[in-house]
């Protein structure tokens, strides 16, 4: 690294691979993505804590979700049914019983480089932190192929060797709150186009929730979480901007570095053995 104009320039070893598009992800590539994300989450927390990066506890993640919910509620544009659904999820203690891990914090399909069905690199590390692992996985739910998130989550759990029982459900919750964040981005920037788009998506989400009462965000005791309601989000016809995480477009969220697929790309960090 070297000082450049009051900031730093960091040059990495060239990482070969093609940028990944969400609609082009196959179940095989999804499995490789799941394993790559698992490798990040298996890093020791000292990677983050030793350099003073953000560290969120499970209760902090819950409070962030509540803050987003409250801000969205204040707009008066979120259907009451969705607000109630999200409030119940926030109050469900089982949802927040997880161990925070190192996460990238800003993943989308475009974060990955691949050759064939193998991930070769991950781009953008400016949001590295300790937080909810579901945050790195929810974007996969935007795939039109149900086998994609299923393959990714299965490979992730297998690679981690730790089964986070409510991971899929928190990923669904995170995906739904992304629509709320898209709404907040529209109201904050006073963009009628974005706001109207978000409102339309919220009402479509409400319709889907009313049609399918078998997949609530809150769970009956001892019922295993599934990806069924996660994949149903695709039926909303979410625009590409939301599928690629609208929060990244919000001024309140720092933009992850997207330096391209050559010298500035970084391969996924290799965790030590044993992991964690």
Name what the model sees in each region.
Residues 1-53:
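ATP-binding pocket architecture of kinase catalytic cores
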Residues 158-248:
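Helix-rich C-terminal or lid/interface subdomains of diverse kinases
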